[in-house]
Amino acid sequence: MAPPEVVNQTVRNGPHDLIIREQDVNGPKHAYVTFLAGDGDYVKGVIGLAKGLRKVKAAFPLVVAVLPDVPAEHRRVLVEQGCRVREIEPVFPPCTGKDSPFVRAYFVVNYCKLRLWEFVEYNKMIYMDADIQVFDNIDHLFDLPRGFFYGVVDCLCEMYGHPCPQKLPWPAQLGPQPSFYFNGGMFMFEPNLNTYNELLSKLGITPPTPFAEQDFLNMFFRDISKPIPPIYNLLVAMLWRHPEWVDLDKVKVVHYCVSGSKPWRYTGKEENMDRADIKMLVNKWWDIYNAFTPWI
């Protein structure tokens, strides 16, 4: 991932102004994108992702959509890693009262991903959560036909419907169940202001459901969703839930989404975290984070 040609933009960040890299008007038409909120340790995941993309010689930049509460120092580090930092405003679903409808309360912040459809200087973007690492070049995904929303089928053992015994029903308020249910941690989409406005309008009249923006995006794009192979988003839980579907030698993208599997927090003490394959994948992440030198 070559250092981007950029123009400077001043971002107001409390008492300090931060000069960040911004999209060059003649820049690339595709990009990778991730999302960061708050002042916690997820910035390490974004740094790791940026280094991973550079190591596999990705041809396109990594855009980091940040909420206003991401501190200036974190933004500065990301710029130093070659990221294009873009501040976005929060997005909130309709109020649901005191009780959270989400499987995990923090899922509510993930609705901010809808802002990514505003990034219309790009024709296509591949979104990846900050707890993802890329171990092989995936630029070729940008060559897939336009007009579709691409994602990897999620493991539904703890979600809805097939292929495992049903544990939670697909929310009736979201209409017909999609033909496949993709994971919201990695997907390819086409930024578009009309789509963006439709997303926000639909969100305003759609009650929140357990898996937050993942449910919502599955509902919204149900008619144009296309599956891509699981090698592009290996959920680490698949290693013990569906080992028959996993060939680690072919996996290009790993999603450290299970509790205890985040490499920068890893202790090996949580359930399933003492597995040899998990330890190997955590070590691979750290090899990139610690050893890869920027812009070489």
Please state what every model-predicted region is.
Residues 1-296:
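Glycosyltransferase catalytic domains, chiefly GT-A lineage
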